[in-house]
Amino acid sequence: MSTPQRRSILRIIWRIVGGLALVLIAAAGWLAWWATHGGEAWLDRKAEERIHAVIEQASVPGYNFTLGRLKADARHGRLTVSDAELSFEPRLLDSLRTGAYQYLFAGKVAKAELRGLSFWRLLLHGEFRVGAIELQGPEFHYYTGPKRVDLADPFKRLGHGGNSLVSVLFTDTLSIADASATVQDLNKDLPELKVNGLSVHGTSVRVSAAGRNAGVRLAVAGTDLRVDSISTLLPDGSNLHIGAVALSRTKQNGLLTAIRITPPPTDSMSVDRMAKSVMTLAVDSLVMAGLDFDRSIADEALFIHRMGIHGLHVAVDLDKSLPEEPPEPVRLPPAALASMPFSIRVDTLALVDAEVHYRERDAKTGRWGEVPFSRMSAQFRNITNDAAATTDSITGRFNATFFDSAQVVGTYAAALDGSEKFSITTTVTRLPLVEVNRATQPLMRMQVEKGILNSLTMRMEGNARRAKGTMELAYTGLLVRVEPGTPTALRSSMFGNVMDAMLQQQYGGGMTADRERNFSIERDPDRSMLTYLWHATREGLTRNLVPEAKERMRTMVRTDLDNWKKERAARKVKK
């Protein structure tokens, strides 16, 4: 190509580039003029119209959404919403009670701000993309009915009017600060739940149309949730309070602190009081690791790899001087798990530094006895009601200090195949028996003066109807008598004089034994696992102690007979 031709082509190229530059400059100038002479206002107005249309199209029948004020700012990519409220018509409450709806939702927020909004993308492509959404101090209200709740239910009902004006809503961050929430069960199975100081931080939040008449899909990359406090009233009138809560989908962990269950005040003058267990509970912290948020929400279940309960303190009082309540069936642990309305799986449950203090008031003595457990720790595995886990078993081991002195260790296993079969082994070692006076004196008028329980081992196997097992019991120097001050008639009915005579030094003094006995018991349907174990323990102790008492009676008879013979022989010698 000759030099003149090349110069001609270059001149043409430069003219084209220059022309394009002039066009761009002109377009930029026109855009600047347009923006300063009502263009931005037009863009703001069109964006507001589009948003109002989207809200109208997305509305679910029976729900009403109102906006106090919607202000678009195209120059700064900002959208501000004031006094927004979502409510539902009262007639929907009947639909909730009949099961037509699974739950209802209402809420309002004084101010919501969206920053980094692309207005042109919204108008041209129907994509609502923002850098951040912030809601300050909103209020949320949930109402549930008799049906099992599907959290995705409202999303399925959106977009049934056809093609959506907005196909995608995406934000880099979603922040909800200082919110409050209530959950109310219209079926009256659960009391109202109050949540205060709720904060949520989500990242890469995306809501997209799933297809014509197919609702919408929600996807979130990461979520962190914090709560200042949660409170509610339990069915028995006790107050449940939970302090700070922190849950993280990103880290798959959770923390609940300062959990408290406080019974209602006791009205000593009430004629309706019944003999029932009154429990006070406190937990320092509940720590969850491996918390599967996605499966928990998608499957309406609770999946946790490890849960730790730290600083559990339980106090239970039972006043047996009051009339007994009508018996109600009580399920053993596997059956109780199976009856839960949602799926649960906890791979490992650990109990750290727990205390249990049981008090009981006897109807005859009118006094309170106590049984304390301290420094308790335990670990249980495979706690689940998953139908696919029927070939598995719940297993666990535990240890504690009994009456502030003896050591208790044990194991537990329960089948998950519906048979309710279980096995438990418990060993108690080195208990100074005078410690049990805190229970035996006020409840039984029996006083232990000395003796050591060297070891007690109980092995028990059973199901929800009956159990059997063995008890090995070894004790040294047991000396027990009817409590001083017991009325004479009552002391006689308790064979107090016989007991005093049996344990005299001439008959051997304190009893010592090392034996093993079998036992079998039937379970009342209203008996919990703990009372089931106490029934077995009492039966095992009876079968071990009665033979020793009978042997001591025979020793008394033989000794008295020998003494009588010696005295008779001595009298004959004197004659």
Predicted features by range, described:
Residues 322-323, 328-334, 338-346, 350, ...:
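Long, K/E/R/D-enriched contiguous segments that form extended
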Residues 192-194, 207-246, 256-268, 367-444, ...:
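Interface amphipathic segments
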Residues 2-61:
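N-terminal type II signal-anchor transmembrane helix
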Residues 2-18, 413-415, 427, 444-575:
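Extended terminal
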Residues 53, 58-147, 159-187, 203-257, ...:
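Flexible beta-edge/linker motif
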Residues 151-163, 197, 273-275, 325-338:
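Short amphipathic alpha-helical linker/capping segments at the junctions of internal repeats
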Residues 147-155, 322-329, 444, 486-492:
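Flexible, surface-exposed loop regions and adjacent strand-edge segments
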Residues 133-136, 307-311, 374, 454-464:
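Short secondary-structure subsegments characteristic of cysteine-rich extracellular domains
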